[in-house]
Swiss-Prot record:
Family stated for the protein in its record: Belongs to the universal ribosomal protein uL4 family.
Key words, A-Z: Ribonucleoprotein, Ribosomal protein, RNA-binding, rRNA-binding
One BP annotation, GO: translation
Lineage: Bacteria, Pseudomonadati, Pseudomonadota, Alphaproteobacteria, Rhodobacterales
Molecular function terms from GO: rRNA binding; structural constituent of ribosome
Assembly and interaction partners: Part of the 50S ribosomal subunit.
Protein name: Large ribosomal subunit protein uL4
Length: 205
């Protein structure tokens, strides 16, 4: 499939052939969902922790005698039934990450690219270059109508462009190896350079 290539100033710069296996799939929400869950679960710190009845700072002495008070039978003040007592089966420090095969992760990335293509939210640009001035780049981005965009460059990111883009709200740039399903789906517009297209095709073949 062919898609027009533009420059940062909006001028046309020819066209590019996109691989059907990467950009022409019928997007499946279940595949995208599984990959996004895998990404977000692996990113979760898992540092949540509450104290059990053996860890709270209370005496383990029985609070009153067993019989003869007319009240319910109780043991230590640290029991979960009391305010300030331990928590029964509360969260512990653990990893939320789970395994997902490399083949499935690649498939998810192909479906994410295809989803952007199908939605008309994919833009191919000739290259990313800048004089390092944030104001000039922000004006170009505004003229192109990119409000929340992710730019995928080639194997390495143009450092001058990255510096200029750093303070533009809603604009992010990643190298090809950093391209992932979550970041692609989170943005309204996916922008890929010609070098990025070639690198993605080499990575996902």
């Amino acid at each position: 499939m062919k898609l027009d290539v533009i420059k940062l100033d909006g001028a046309k710069a020819g066209s590019v052939d996109l691989d059907e296996a990467l950009f022409g799939l019928e997007p499946r929400a279940d595949i995208l969902h599984r990959v996004v869950r895998w990404q977000r679960n692996n990113a979760q710190a898992g540092t949540h922790k509450v104290k059990t009845r053996s860890e709270v700072n209370y005496s383990t002495k029985k609070i009153y005698r067993q019989k003869g008070t007319g009240g319910a039978r109780h043991g230590a003040r640290s029991a979960p039934i009391f305010r300030g007592g331990g928590v029964y089966k509360g969260p512990k420090v653990r990893s939320h990450g789970h395994e997902l095969t490399k083949k499935f992760r690649k498939l998810g990335l192909c479906h994410a690219l295809s989803a952007k293509m199908k939605a008309g939210e994919l833009v191919i640009i000739d290259e990313v270059s800048s004089d390092g001035k944030t104001a000039a780049l922000a004006k170009q981005v505004a003229n192109l109508g990119w409000k929340r965009a992710l730019i995928i460059d080639g194997a390495t990111v143009n450092e001058t462009f990255a510096q200029a883009a750093r303070n533009i709200d809603g604009l992010d740039i990643l190298p090809t190896m950093g391209a992932n399903v979550y970041d692609i789906l989170k943005r309204d517009t996916l922008v890929i350079t010609k070098a990025g297209v070639e690198a993605l095709e080499a990575r996902l073949k």
